[in-house]
């Protein structure tokens, strides 16, 4: 790669799943993975990219799962939102230890723990090269953190949502179950809907489509993949118009 190569994005929204943080543990937060992700985000900041982050909470709690067991769905989702705040606190701490300025915002007030979400404040922080972590989802039950990622991405005028997963991109079928599944380089929003490909839930996906927000799905477990994505190299699957 030429040394004078420049990033293809100025501002991104990085969506991390809670499961990505748990590593091989199966639950909770793997400190080594957290630190590696913080280092990869630091690389982006050093390239001059403005970074917003949304983290899921599935490594700690899943509201939908307990709803099936009889818990009120609203209560379960509130607990799931708090799980994303816990992950956000861990990520902010990891970024601070990596000497990266980061701010944690919550969709609902948690005074003394983190800041309330403010669109204007978030934009100002991003312009000053601060990483902004958006937690507590959208602040409403029944909406996933993928919906939160697309919503915040649109609000902060990110050029792309980078969805970090455990696989190399979007496949024609589940690569864990079907060895013949093929990896797509690029898809249109329409193709994703027609082929019924699982990229993110429909509410999140249609929000991105309606606002022409591109989505790139890539494997966060592959070292250097995030950097390759922002440098415009062949990595993952791009979904656009």
Swiss-Prot record:
Reaction(s) the record says it catalyses: UMP + ATP = UDP + ADP
Residues the entry annotates as binding UMP: 57, 77, 138-145
Single GO MF annotation: UMP kinase activity
Gene Ontology CC: one annotated term: cytosol
Pfam families: AA_kinase
Biological pathway: Pyrimidine metabolism; CTP biosynthesis via de novo pathway; UDP from UMP (UMPK route): step 1/1
InterPro entries referenced in this protein's UniProt entry, alphabetically: AceGlu_kinase-like_sf, Asp/Glu/Uridylate_kinase, Uridylate_kinase, Uridylate_kinase_bac
Record-listed ATP binding positions: 15-18, 58, 62, 165, 171, 174
EC number, UniProt record: 2.7.4.22
GO biological process terms on file: 'de novo' CTP biosynthetic process; UDP biosynthetic process
Subunit structure comment from the entry: Homohexamer.
PANTHER family named among the record's database cross-references: URIDYLATE KINASE, URIDYLATE KINASE PUMPKIN, CHLOROPLASTIC
Name of the featured protein: Uridylate kinase
Gene for this chain: pyrH
